């Protein structure tokens, strides 16, 4: 009987020296993706893909491990310098930025692109109650 053989794609270096590090840090997870200037994803990782589950995904430690994993893959593809775009209000935002520095990538620019409504629609009721407690 024949067995199914799984084909493994060989990593081909993309030879991109300058990229963009998108860090999306929500209240429950942190997602890091490295792209080139056009927005094509080179590598990515999240707190869940590194192995954390449940409430541990939102911690700063989980964000640092996810950033280290994504940065390692990005370095294999040739990225040496990054522009960091931070989005969200989670715990892992600053921890992920610091981990990019310690992983050996040079930061050219840091931008905070968190969307802020300028008197848009009324927020959901659950969000409204959370603001009253503060």
Swiss-Prot record:
Cited InterPro entries: Ribosomal_uS11, Ribosomal_uS11_bac-type, Ribosomal_uS11_CS, Ribosomal_uS11_sf
MF (Gene Ontology): rRNA binding; structural constituent of ribosome
One Pfam family in the UniProt entry: Ribosomal_S11
Keywords annotated in UniProt: Ribonucleoprotein, Ribosomal protein, RNA-binding, rRNA-binding
UniProt xrefs under SUPFAM superfamilies: Translational machinery components (SSF53137)
Assembly behavior: Part of the 30S ribosomal subunit. Interacts with proteins S7 and S18. Binds to IF-3.
NCBIfam families: PRK05309.1, uS11_bact
Protein name: Small ribosomal subunit protein uS11
Organism annotation: Mesomycoplasma hyopneumoniae (strain J / ATCC 25934 / NCTC 10110) (Mycoplasma hyopneumoniae)
Gene that this polypeptide is encoded by: rpsK
